[in-house]
Amino acid sequence: LAIKDSIDYGFTTEQQIKSVLKKKGLFPEGKSLKDINVRSIEKILAQYPFIKNAECYITSGNKVNIEIYQRIPVIRVISDNGDNYYIDDEGKVMDYTDQAVHVAIATGFIDRKFAQNELYELGKYIRTNPFWKSQVEQIHVTPKKEIEIVPRVGDQILFLGKIDDYTENFSKLQK
């Protein structure tokens, strides 16, 4: 059993996976190979909210391998309507967890459609840009859907304006 990205993201533990499979009677340990249904294991694990993909197969040495890839959060959303969730690297909503995740937090007037589209794109941009990833602490969305950035360092609030101009505005700020 291997959780491929467990160093960076700890949403899923080996113990949790074993527990899920044991409850469903699918944990392979102690079973003969003919009694192990790898597709059922994959199907059950795919239903787990923090798993992006699970691959289960039997090796040429007759061992059962389970490889798990976790969903990767891009941005955390805490909206004015009380919603609290993550958007993952595919633009899908992930339930909030107490697990510490180092991503920018988006607050303010945010509905799910806006979060899964515009904020998702902004979050991806920040996450893949080393400079902005280290600088952006919070993204605030005003009632007019304008973006304000709260940096990790300093007391300033950076007003970016409408979200469709963010790449140009970030480039200007970085110079």
What are these language model-derived features?
Residues 148-175:
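C-terminal solvent-exposed extensions
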Residues 46-62:
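Short, well-structured beta-strand/strand-turn elements
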